[in-house]
């Protein structure tokens, strides 16, 4: 059963735990009557998230694949929780963009090796990850966003920290929402 952990700044964070797997889901609306929101819906949104979250994300590497609608993305997180014995992590995924008239999805699945991406930090990969960033285009000025994801870490998190990945992603999306709603043309 899904439970709402928090709703901060219009970004709702849901949580569901089944055995060892934890699923998170964010829901939010982004409205700005001064800027066409649909112009932000491409792979550069990940670079914008990086720019807005330098305290959480060390860097994001993006590598074009053979198809224009698919990228290999490596998100290196800052060393969060090292005082609790947690190592620095990175999330490596193959992300495909699917687009229709009023909807864009970025579907990410686990990628096991880095290929051309060279990390200059000592970080460990997240064991397993998947995500779906679903953006419904209500109008050029209004987006409904749902981000569903799960992460399986090599290291077992203490019970009081198991919601931390969701809370960090929620913080990233609060900043994205705030930025997009406050820019002007």
What are these regions (language model features)?
Residues 1-72, 83:
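Hydrophobic ligand-binding cavity/cleft-lining segments
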Residues 36-40, 48, 94, 147, ...:
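Hydrophobic pocket/interface hotspot
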Residues 164, 168-178:
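C-terminal functional regions of eukaryotic proteins
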Residues 178-185:
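Short, highly charged C-terminal tails/helix-capping segments
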Residues 19, 29, 59-119:
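Glycine-rich portal/gate segments that line the openings of hydrophobic small-molecule binding cavities
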Residues 19-23, 101, 140-144:
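Coil-to-beta-strand transition motifs
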Residues 31, 80, 152-154:
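Short coil/turn motifs at secondary-structure junctions
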Residues 92-95, 107-166:
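Beta-strand/loop substructures that line and gate deep hydrophobic ligand-binding cavities in soluble
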């Amino acid at each position: 059963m899904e439970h709402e952990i928090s709703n901060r700044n219009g970004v709702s964070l849901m949580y569901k735990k089944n055995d060892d797997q934890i699923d998170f889901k964010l829901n939010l609306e982004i409205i700005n009557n001064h800027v066409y929101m649909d112009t932000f819906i491409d792979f550069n949104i990940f670079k914008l998230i990086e720019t807005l979250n330098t305290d959480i994300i060390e860097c994001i590497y993006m590598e074009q694949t053979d198809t224009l609608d698919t990228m290999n993305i490596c998100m290196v997180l800052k060393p969060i929780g090292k005082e609790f014995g947690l190592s620095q992590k990175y999330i490596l995924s193959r992300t495909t963009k699917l687009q229709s008239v009023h909807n864009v999805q970025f579907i990410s699945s686990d990628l096991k090796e880095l290929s051309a991406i060279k990390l200059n930090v000592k970080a460990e990969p997240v064991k397993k990850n998947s995500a779906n960033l679903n953006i419904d285009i209500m109008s050029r000025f209004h987006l409904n966003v749902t981000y569903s994801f799960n992460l399986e870490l090599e290291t077992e998190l203490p019970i009081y920290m198991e919601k931390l990945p969701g809370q960090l992603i929620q913080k990233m999306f609060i900043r994205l929402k705030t930025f997009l709603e406050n820019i002007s043309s």
